[in-house]
Regions:
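Intrinsically disordered, low-complexity serine/threonine- and proline-rich regulatory segments
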Residues: 1-14, 21-25, 59-94
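Positively charged, polyanion-binding regions of nucleic-acid-associated proteins
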Residues: 6-28, 93-111, 137, 142
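Short acidic, hydrophobic short linear motifs in intrinsically disordered regions
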Residues: 23-47, 111-127
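A short, conserved structural fragment
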Residues: 56-74, 137-154
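Short, amphipathic alpha-helical interaction segments positioned at domain boundaries
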Residues: 77-116, 160-191, 195
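Extended, charged alpha-helical interaction scaffolds
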Residues: 88, 95-137, 144-148, 153-155
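Helical coiled-coil/dimerization "stalks"
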Residues: 120-123, 152-166, 208-225
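Amphipathic alpha-helical oligomerization/assembly segments
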Residues: 183-224
Length: 225
């Protein structure tokens, strides 16, 4: 089955896979939790700022494609969502824990080297070494419908990067990452500046409070003398 998903659909499914593995007690996810996962600043490339409405629309599209299902617990009025991706339900698409972890990281962070994947996917599945990651990537490339491709090595780089192949052809991986990555870097810069400004403001407040305490102590000492 040839999968052609948009970047937003890939992000939603990647988040559902990640949270199922790393926080099973909180899975399936509510719309709010899913939106937070999509916009998470750590382990994401690019960083996104999706509204609940956009995430809901994306989820609805995935439900129509039978890749996500809505789940409501007994007595609960809040719908929760779980993926049906890479499971036994899809037969040939069922993956091992290591394959699933690698695919999830590629979906959440885009093209990566085996070394990067080992460090980042370790939270979801155990890899004995980088060679283990490379074998997993080869298995994903050698399937009847390849799920991963090896990208041309960049000049001066020792390791080649690998990318998933489940994106819509209308959204080339490299082009999307290059465009979105710039926005991500800008956003990251704004976030860091904002954090520094908040820290400075907090320090200024603390200094002002200390100055008041010192003045109070001086006044008290003066009165005693």
């Amino acid at each position: 089955m040839k999968l052609q998903l948009s970047p937003l659909e890939i992000r939603v499914i990647g988040v559902l896979i990640e949270k199922e593995i790393t926080t099973p007690d909180q899975y399936p996810l509510s719309l709010n939790a899913l939106s937070n996962g999509c916009n998470q600043k750590s382990n994401r490339e690019p960083v996104m700022g999706l509204t609940d409405a956009v995430v809901q629309e994306t989820v609805d599209q995935l439900i129509k494609k039978h890749l996500v299902r809505s789940h409501s617990g007994f007595g609960s009025r809040v719908s929760k969502y779980q993926h049906r991706f890479f499971t036994a339900e899809f037969g040939a698409l069922a993956l091992s824990p290591q394959e699933l972890a690698v695919m999830c990281e590629l979906m959440l962070r885009g093209p990566q080297t085996p070394g990067e994947l080992r460090g980042r996917a370790e939270r979801m599945a155990r890899f004995t070494d980088v060679e283990h990651v490379e074998r997993t990537l080869n298995d994903l490339m050698e399937r009847g419908e390849p799920l991963v491709a090896r990208l041309p090595r960049h000049p001066g780089k020792r390791e080649a990067r690998y990318a998933h192949l489940i994106g819509d052809e209308a959204f080339p991986i490299e082009e999307f990452m290059a465009t979105a990555g710039t926005g991500s870097a800008d956003q990251g810069g704004h976030d860091r500046i904002g954090a520094l400004e908040r820290t400075v403001a907090e320090l200024q407040t603390q200094v002002a409070a200390l100055e008041e305490i010192v003045e109070s102590l001086i006044d008290s000492a003066g009165k005693r003398t």
